[in-house]
Amino acid sequence: MGSSTKKKKEKKKDFQKTKLKVGKTKAKPDNFTDTSFRAKTITLNQQSLHITAPSSDAQFTHHVSLLSSKSDTQRRDSLAHLTTSFVSRPVDSPLPQPVSVLLPTLLPLILDASSSVRTQLLKLLRALPANDIQDHVPQLLPYIRAGMTHLAADIRVSAVEVLSWLVYVAGAEVVSCAGGWIKTLNCFLSVLGWHTEESSKWSGNRASFGKSGAKGQPMVKVLAALAVFLQAGIGRPDDGMGDSSDEDSAMGVSGWEFPLCHAAQHMVPQATAPFVHLNLFGQPRDEEGEMYETREDRYRVFENRFLRAVQRGLEGARSEGGEVGRASAGVSKVLKEAIAYGPGA
C-alpha cells in the first residue's frame, strides 16, 4: 500500500501549484536555458576576410543580379543603387554595363506587382542616356503594351508613365517602328474604353482604374500620354522645317515651278517606296505589325481606323469636366491641328 500511495502523490505533484514562500525565488524548470551571457565576437564559417572592398563595377554587377530576387524590398533597393550609380557618374563617361545588357533584366519589372519597384524603375529609366534608348525602342514596346493591357489598374498606369517617358526620349522611333503605331493606339483605346461605339453607351465597358481612379488622376495621365503620342505621330511638323523653304523662296530658289500647279506631285518622290501602302504585288500583310515611317502613312491609318473612336471618346471625356475635361482638351487640340494639316502638303 505504501508504494502505491507514493506513486499517486508523485503523479498529483505535476498538477499541483507549488506555494511560494516569502523571500524565496521560484524554482527553475528542468529545461531552463541560461541566456544571460554576452558574446564578445560572432564567428561565421563563411565569413569573407578580404582586406580590399569590392570594386564599383563588381557591386554594380551584383545589384543587377539581385533584380530578379523574390523580395520586393531587395529589387527596389537594387534599382535605387543602380540609379545612384547612373546619376553620380562623370559626364560623358560610359555606363558600367551597356544598355543592351541591362534591358533584358529591367524590362520585366514594368509588370512587377510592387508599386515601389515600378516607381523606382521609372526613375532608373529616366537616368539612362537618351541616345542609348533610341536603338532599343522595339524591345521596350512589347512590355509597355503588355502593361497597358494588364488586369491590375496600377500596372496599367505605370506602363502609361513609362510610355510617356519613351515618347519624350525617342518619339520618332516609337511611332515609326514595327507595330509601334497601330498596336499602341489599340492599347490606348483599350485602356480608355473607347474601342467601339457600343462601349461608349454602356458604363460597364468604361475605363476603370480601381480606388486610385476615383478622382480621375489615372485618366488624366493616360490622356496626357495620348496627346504626346499623337503629337509625335501625326502632329503638325515643326515650323522650323518651313523656315528654310521660306528663306529659299525669298532668295528665288523655289519659284522655278511657276506657272505650274502642284509641280511637287510630279517630281521624283523623296520617300523610298511612296506606293508601298497600296501593296500592289505583295502578299496579304499584317497592318498592325507594319512600320509607318512617314507622317502621311500614319495619318492615313489613323483616319481610317481610329479617328471616329477617338473623337467619340473625347466628347465623353469633355462632358465629365474637371481635370479629365482639361486633359481631353489637350488631346483635342493636337487632333484638330493634325486634321487641319491633313495628310501633308
UniProtKB/Swiss-Prot annotation:
<keyword id="KW-0698">rRNA processing</keyword>
<comment type="function">
    <text>Component of the RIX1 complex required for processing of ITS2 sequences from 35S pre-rRNA.</text>
</comment>
<dbReference type="GO" id="GO:0120330">
    <property type="term" value="C:rixosome complex"/>
</dbReference>
<feature type="region of interest" description="Disordered">
    <location>
        <begin position="1"/>
        <end position="30"/>
    </location>
</feature>
<dbReference type="Pfam" id="PF12333">
    <property type="entry name" value="Ipi1_N"/>
</dbReference>
<comment type="similarity">
    <text>Belongs to the IPI1/TEX10 family.</text>
</comment>
<comment type="subunit">
    <text>Component of the RIX1 complex, composed of ipi1, rix1/ipi2 and ipi3 in a 1:2:2 stoichiometry. The complex interacts (via rix1) with mdn1 (via its hexameric AAA ATPase ring) and the pre-60S ribosome particles.</text>
</comment>
<dbReference type="InterPro" id="IPR016024">
    <property type="entry name" value="ARM-type_fold"/>
</dbReference>
<protein>
    <recommendedName>
        <fullName>Pre-rRNA-processing protein ipi1</fullName>
    </recommendedName>
</protein>
<keyword id="KW-0539">Nucleus</keyword>
<dbReference type="InterPro" id="IPR024679">
    <property type="entry name" value="Ipi1_N"/>
</dbReference>
<dbReference type="InterPro" id="IPR011989">
    <property type="entry name" value="ARM-like"/>
</dbReference>
<dbReference type="GO" id="GO:0005634">
    <property type="term" value="C:nucleus"/>
</dbReference>
<dbReference type="GO" id="GO:0006364">
    <property type="term" value="P:rRNA processing"/>
</dbReference>
<keyword id="KW-0690">Ribosome biogenesis</keyword>
<feature type="compositionally biased region" description="Basic residues">
    <location>
        <begin position="1"/>
        <end position="11"/>
    </location>
</feature>
